[in-house]
């Protein structure tokens, strides 16, 4: 069996340019069983797929999953080897920069170097938090985001050994709200940002924008899990059109898809304009819902730890909301147990993940994209 290596994210989006499809980027905070199920669904549907993990989840000290960049990469490679599938990307999501000072940039370089050493083939630089409200125009307001994004993009290019790589950048902080509701990225903001990056010799494949989505689960006031229907598709189309009109070949990266009805994605999402769709918390839900049945003691211990740790900071909120919003932090303290699940439990998680991934790939119109990318690479 061939040793499987991830393909470059840039090749995926170059190959699929003009194709009405969304590439699923699966963030699997507990990869065992679940990554294999997603990979198997990708192979059976001939769908290219990305596996991603964010800085907060996986850094040099393990983040809140307990996995270093190398650990996560190895888990994905193991799943690809088991399934014998080749059309996948390992993506470093949300390499967040929130201050922009030299200390933070140096720690970011060290993280990126670890991701490069591990074998990641795509990177998302997220300096969207850096916005100067005192700026006289958009260019000044975005200056720090532009500077930090440029510096990190050049660092990747200078240290990846000449290999191609995928690049995602971000403008507009996802999930941010003000007194009027969710703050949305404007078309002008997107084109100003991308044009400045182009002038700095930075050429991203993807732009993440704030378009009404939020990360994680969505709950009502009583603590019930509800669908997320807040993504502003007309605004998303307007941003995509402005990018095209500016002569830029950059797709939209849609963050925060968990909870969005798949029939809405299937029938109404502008596929191709939205080129990448992030699905993260959904796979976490698969883990917990399966563990509830197959590993009830583990589930109860993780529930209790989460409530004991976070209830004092969330006085008055239902326990279901507290758990749903914070259970991701339970992976690290329970890693020794979640990475030692029974074969029966892993089989169940894989089966559920397989079924769920089939539906996402269908809703994203991903079927057949692996062959398109494979043919592109063979002809390159």
Where are these regions (language model features)?
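C-terminal extensions of enzymes
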Residues: 1, 319-380
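Extreme N-terminal cap/leader segments of soluble proteins
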Residues: 1-33, 63-66
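Alpha/beta enzyme core
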Residues: 9-16, 32-57, 69-70, 78-82, ...
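Active-site mouth loops of central-metabolism enzymes
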Residues: 21-32, 63, 91-108, 179-185, ...
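Glycine-rich, N-terminal phosphate-binding loop and its surrounding beta-alpha-beta segment
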Residues: 62-97
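Glycine-rich phosphate-binding active-site loops on the catalytic face of alpha/beta enzymes
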Residues: 126-134, 271-291
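C-terminal helical cap(s) of enzyme catalytic domains, especially alpha/beta-barrels
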Residues: 133-145, 219-225, 287-304, 350, ...
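C-terminal hydrophobic structural anchor segments
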Residues: 285-339
């Amino acid at each position: 069996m061939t040793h499987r290596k991830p393909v470059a994210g840039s090749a995926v989006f170059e190959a699929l340019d003009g194709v009405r499809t969304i590439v699923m980027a699966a963030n699997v905070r507990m990869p065992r069983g679940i990554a294999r199920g997603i990979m198997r669904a990708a192979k059976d549907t001939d769908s290219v797929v990305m596996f991603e993990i964010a800085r907060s989840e996986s850094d040099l000290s393990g983040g809140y999953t307990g996995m270093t960049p190398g650990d996560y990469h190895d888990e994905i490679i193991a799943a690809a080897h088991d399934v014998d599938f080749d059309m996948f990307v390992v993506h470093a999501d949300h390499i967040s920069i929130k201050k922009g000072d030299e200390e933070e940039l140096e720690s970011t370089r060290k993280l990126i170097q670890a991701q490069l050493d591990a074998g990641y083939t795509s990177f998302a630089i997220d300096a969207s938090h850096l916005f100067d409200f005192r700026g006289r125009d958009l260019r000044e307001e975005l200056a720090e985001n532009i500077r930090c994004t440029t510096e990190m993009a050049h660092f990747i290019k200078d240290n990846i050994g000449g290999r191609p790589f995928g690049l995602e950048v971000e403008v507009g902080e996802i999930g941010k709200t003000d007194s009027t509701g969710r703050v949305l990225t404007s078309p002008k903001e997107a084109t100003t940002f991308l044009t400045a990056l182009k002038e700095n010799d930075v050429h991203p494949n993807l732009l993440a924008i704030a378009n009404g989505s939020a990360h994680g689960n969505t709950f009502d006031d009583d603590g019930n899990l509800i669908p997320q229907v807040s993504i502003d598709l007309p605004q998303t189309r307007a941003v995509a059109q402005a990018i095209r009109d500016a002569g830029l070949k950059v797709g939209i990266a849609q963050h925060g898809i968990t909870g969005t009805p798949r029939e809405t994605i299937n029938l109404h999402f502008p596929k191709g304009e939205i080129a990448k769709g992030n699905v993260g918390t959904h796979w976490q839900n698969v883990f917990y819902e399966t563990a509830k049945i197959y590993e009830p003691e583990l589930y109860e211990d993780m529930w209790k730890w989460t409530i004991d740790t976070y209830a004092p900071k969330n006085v008055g909120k239902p326990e279901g909301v507290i758990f749903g919003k914070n259970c991701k932090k339970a992976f690290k303290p329970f890693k020794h147990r979640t990475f030692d699940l029974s074969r029966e439990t892993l089989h169940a998680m894989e089966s559920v993940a397989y079924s769920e991934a089939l539906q996402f790939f269908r809703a994203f119109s991903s079927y057949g994209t692996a062959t398109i990318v494979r043919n592109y690479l063979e002809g390159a």
